[in-house]
Amino acid sequence: MKRNMKWIRTKLPIIIPIILVIALAVVCVNLWQHKTIEENDLMVMCKSSVNAAMEHFENYQSNGNEVEYISGVAEFRAYMTTYLCLTDEPSDADYTWCNILYGYMTMKPEEVKANISDLIDALEYLAEDYDHPNGFNLINALNNKIAAE
């Protein structure tokens, strides 16, 4: 019995920290993988929202169907939401430019519709890469163009 107690007193302080370190490493790896998977899912959602918005706006451009325009605006808003989740920076200038454009889409739809080809050009860049700087520059230029009208 004394021998077992001696073993417990000498080996247990070494074994417990090793087990805790292994458990902590497993938890950290699991959390890292979950974050990576979640980020990949958000990127897919972001890209699919931009592609859907672009498709709706192209359909609106070709047939003038108001439902296509409204669907494009909704998909653009979905893109903005996923973009914000990916960047975690609500004060990001790119997000602000998108937010201004979204405001124009809802409050001044006729001005946006008159410049729908410029909007589609911007979305083509964002369809390639959800944070492509040229896409945001074209969105900013479109905002300035609409503001000047």
Language model regions located:
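Alpha-helical segments in soluble extracytoplasmic regions
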Residues: 42-45, 49-105, 124-127, 139-140
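C-terminal amphipathic alpha-helix
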Residues: 110-149
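Generic hydrophobic, helix-prone segments enriched in Leu/Val/Ile
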Residues: 24-31, 101, 119-127
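Transmembrane signal-anchor/signal-peptide helices with a preference for the extracytoplasmic
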Residues: 22-44
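N-terminal Sec-pathway targeting helices
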Residues: 2-22
